[in-house]
Amino acid sequence: MKIAGAVALVTGASSGIGAATARELARRGARVILAARRVDLLREQVAAITAAGGQASVIEADISDLASLPRVASEAEAIYGQIDILVNNAGIHIRGKPGQLAPDDIALMVNTNLTGPITLTRLLLPGMLQRRRGVIICVASVAGNIANDWLYSGTKFGLRGYALALRRQLHSSGVSVSVVSPGYIDTPLTSYRHSRMPGPALIANAIAALVERPRREVVAPWWYRIPIALERIAPWLVDFGLRR
């Protein structure tokens, strides 16, 4: 799909990968709707986009609040008349050992990382199918390819599997579905790590490329393809490495 003139909805757009993606799509000529809980941060991103000559709007959205998503979808479609590109980027990572994470935290992670994106996609997909035009991109994770963190990996495996299955089922519909699986990227989600990481612009560029040239899945940075391949052909080696 040509980005210029298209309408994109990006969730989790107040910072990190979502904010970088919104800026990149706007730079390429899309009309972008930024959705997240922190409206103040969203407005800062919109100000930066408009200052650079782009077009953007804000919707307050808590993706974990499933009951609110019909409102989010209808408001998003009303702003520019339709949604051509949906980037399911919102995600959280609450760290905790198995058996120790509170039930509310489990529900929050599952709803934000998995059930929310599925629900929002279900709400926006009919319009795309009717127009036979649309792009859906789900931001999963390398943790959705390599089982490591018990709940985070569980939600990202689920999102990745959902998107890949949806891609097959929508074949020849005019709607493409792709997965982006980032490794460690320098965002608020990885602030606990004290090592050099690529910036979110790397993933934003990958997402923009998928809009224009759809593919099944992109892993970025590229070197994470190596442990992913090992996980598939020699999982015992990955078991050994993760236990060290």
Walk through the language-model features, giving the residues of each:
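Active-site helix of classical SDR
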Residues: T121, T155-K156
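Conserved glycine-rich cofactor-binding loop
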Residues: V7, S14-S15
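Conserved glycine-rich Rossmann-like NAD(P)H-binding loop of the short-chain dehydrogenase/reductase
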Residues: R28-Q45
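Residue(s) in the substrate-gating loop at a strand-loop-helix junction
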Residues: S141
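The beta1-alpha1 cofactor-binding region of Rossmann-like NAD(H)/NADP(H)-dependent oxidoreductases
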Residues: A61-R71, P103
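C-terminal helical subdomain
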Residues: V179, Y192-I228, R232
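Substrate-binding pocket helix/loop in short-chain dehydrogenase/reductase
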Residues: K97-V110
